[in-house]
Each structure stands twice: as structure tokens, then as C-alpha cells.
Amino acid sequence: MEAARPAGTFVVVGGGIAGVTCAEQLAINFPAEDILLVTASPVIKAVTNFKQVSKVLEEFDVEEQPSTMLENRFPNIKVIESGVKQLKSDKHCIFTEDGREYVYKKLCLCAGAKPKLICEGNPYVLGIRDTDSAQEFQKQLTKARRIMIVGNGGIALELAYEVEVCEVIWAIKDKAIGNTFFDAGAAEFLTSRLLSEKSEAKLAHKRTIYTVEEAKKETSTKSKADYVGSALGPDWHGGLALKGTEEFSHSIHIETKCEVKKIYLQEEFKIMKKKSLAFPKDHHKSVTVDKEMWPVYVELTNGSIYGCDFLVSATGVTPNVQPFLHGNDFDLGEDGGLRVDEQMRTSLPDIYAAGDICTACWPPSPVWQQMRLWTQARQMGCYAAKCMAAATMGHPIDMDFSFELFAHVTKFFNYKVVLLGKYNAQGLGVDHELMLRCTRGQEYIKVVMHNGRMMGAVLIGETDLEETFENLILNQMDLSSYGEDLLNPDIDIEDYFD
């Protein structure tokens, strides 16, 4: 083991959006200090083309780059390409997988999260979390005639829409798609797009750019079986050709209110003498037995069994805390993340955390909630760096304004989607009202009202209402007198509140 190095004041663990943003902000604050960024991957996630759309809403590209590009931009950032083997918080040092020891004065853990796999060690079950796993999925898909997607989050939603020339069985535990993001009305609006023929003229993807081939050590990622990649950014599928082998274009069947009960390999399935279902054609309810043989069979809790070439597990993530727990008495949140206070501090001195690995445990704004999304990873990483800087210099710091209002802009099924505040009436109980406006195939607008005040909104399509609604939620103005006119398409609501 090498002798401990005087490794500088700041060490950041994790090459995802939170870690890289944190390191960049520290490098700006302390240009004379070496900032160490420890990451198991040869590529890092960089935020580019950042645009502050409104007070809280932001848009940016996520670009995968070789770590050398980060070092070129910030000469005082030193990237250590190795996983963390152990953290000794009492000694203020970390040990990396390559046998080195690094001492820190302040440490920020941004190691992200790992996918919850339905079944560990099954070659026919793929989890999609990072670019490596997304590319493995693309490779498998080129040989596939039918796949099953299990899960109802953002990645599952995108896969269901983007996968072409292949039958897709989509199993969700909820009544409707996209339960994390949408109510039944928005789900119905999107489902009609999903089940209709897709337009050939798809809008150009504009956010994620993959430059994995530029990384000189790309192959080295394959040897690190335990490496947990950072989350995929927005439009992660933009550079991937998600096509299977069948002739037809887009064929999908949704199984609702069910989960995976058991997975059988082909030989096991033959011995069991069970019957699997054929792919339901034209959305008819008639059930026929599948005569084809498949490499893997999936039995659902509703009794249905389908054969497929492989199964995609997209059932969410768990914070990647395991490498840091041994010998360290961290307080953990209910979801398993490292608890952090309003200055992103964990329960251990001089250790901060940001992004998917942490659980926000400060009293939140009434219209903010933590969700493990790339926007919050960027905000938390940036704010954690500012908190570390303030503590180092002995300055007070106010909570960042981005935590005043939950705001997220993304794209689902080629629609622009904006989520604001308590967009699904989270935590409001029954004492709230919903206002809706929907033009099929064009836009879906939902506003959540509580005691005459706007608490949240879902905007699907090009509505141009996000800035106005953001202001109304932040201002908490009494809107009772406006009634239904808030969503009247014949009234320019922006003129009311300029």
C-alpha cells in the first residue's frame, strides 16, 4: 500500500453529473487547489449547453467525455480512474481499488445509484442504468424478435416508445403507464401516442451526445464488473438504433397491475409443461397459446406467461452506498440513501453527499420533493460544492433557490414534458382540486390547486405556460377569482400575470 498522499483539500467520488458538477464548482472556487475526482469509469458525464429557462427550470445537454477533457478544461482537477475500496472517515482518507490512499479535508460522495435487478446473474435479464448497459441492450436487441420491459419509470417509458421492429410486452405494477410522473389522464394521453403508428419524421434529439468511442480506454470498462455507472442523461437513447429483427414497425402490448412472479429458462419451461401466450394482435382480448420456443419465459403475477428473447429490468434504483458503509456510522434515509442536511452534509464530519446517493432530510419547501433525476443531480452537486467552500472559508450560506420549487423538463414519446411543484398532488391528501385542458395528440395541461393556490402542474406539449405557472406556484397568489379561466385557451393567461 502506498503511503498516504497530501491529496489536497477536496476529494469528490463519482464521475456522474453530480460529481463532475461538484468538482467543476470547487475548481472555480479554489483555482489554486487540486480537486481530486475519483471515478471507476474512463468517461465522465459533463453538463453542456446549460440554459436557465426560468427562475428554476433549466435545460442542458449531458455529454459523455473522456476524463482528459475535464482535466483540460480545469487544470486543477485531477481525475483518479479507480473505484473506491474503503472509506476511513475517522482518518479522513479513502483507499482506491488500485491500492492507493488519498487524504481529504472535505469529501463529497456522488457515487449515484444502481439498478434494482429483478433477478441477479440471469443472462437474459438486462438492467439499463448507464451507457455501457444501454449499448449492451442495443446489441442484444439487434437479434431480438420479442422483449419484455418490466418497470414504469422514465427509462421504461422511453424504451416502450423507442424500440422498433420487435414485439414488446410491457409489464407494469400500476394501473397506468408512467405512474412516477403522470396521473391516469396524462397516461391515457400518452398511451394513445404509444399505441398509434409512429410518424417517420421524428424530431431531432437535441440533448444527449455520446462520445464513448473517443475514450482511449473504452475497453477497460468491461473488465470492471462491479463498476456502477452514472445515470443516463436526458434523451439517452438518441444515439442508439433501437431496432429488433421483425418486419413490422411498432408492436406493443401492456400488461397492467402485475409484477414478475418467476423467470424460466427454456429447458426448465419445457419440463414444467406450462403454456405461454402468443403476442396479442391488434389489441384483441382473445388469448392464444404461443407455438414458438423462446430462450426465456416470464410468468407474471396476473397468471400470464410470455416467452421472449430477453427481459429488460427497469424497476428503479437504489442509492450506491455500499462501498462507504464499512466502519463508518452514516445515518441512512428510509430509501437507503445517505441522509444530508440543508447544507448537503452527511452525519459524519467533513463528508458531504449529492445526487442519487443521498436522501434530502431538511424540512422541504411545500412545493419541492427529491426525485432521482439528472436536474437534481446537477443542482445538488453544484450546491454541495458551494457549501464545502463556505465551510472551508467560514462563511454562512443560504439554501439554493433551486430547492424552492421542484421543476423538471424532459421529453416522453417525443412530447416536451414539464413537471412543476406537487405535479401529482403529492402529500396534499384529498383536499385539492385538479384543472385539466387536453387537446388529443397535441397538449395536456393539468394544474393542482389547494385553497385557491397553484401547487403544481404537468405540461405536455408546446404549451408555453411553464414560466407563468412557475411564478404562480412560487408566489402562492390566491387564484380563486380566476376559476376555469386559468386554462381557457381563448385567454392569454400570461397577460394576466405580467
From Swiss-Prot:
Pfam families: Pyr_redox_2, Rubredoxin_C. Coiled coil: none annotated. Its main location: nucleus. It comes from the Eukaryota. Gene3D superfamilies: 3.30.390.30, FAD/NAD(P)-binding domain (3.50.50.60). Its EC number is 1.8.1.-. Its cofactor is FAD. GO terms for molecular function: oxidoreductase activity. Keywords: Acetylation, Cytoplasm, FAD, Flavoprotein, NADP, Nucleus, Oxidoreductase. It is found in: Nucleus; Cytoplasm; Cytoplasm, Myofibril, Sarcomere. Binds 1 FAD per subunit. The modification N-acetylmethionine is found at residue 1. The keyword Cytoplasm applies. The keyword Cytoplasm applies. One of its GO terms (cellular component) is cytoplasm. Probable FAD-dependent oxidoreductase; involved in the cellular oxidative stress response. Required for normal sarcomere structure and muscle fiber integrity. Belongs to the class-I pyridine nucleotide-disulfide oxidoreductase family. PYROXD1 subfamily. This is Pyridine nucleotide-disulfide oxidoreductase domain-containing protein 1. It comes from Rattus norvegicus. The lineage of its organism: Eukaryota, Metazoa, Chordata, Craniata, Vertebrata.
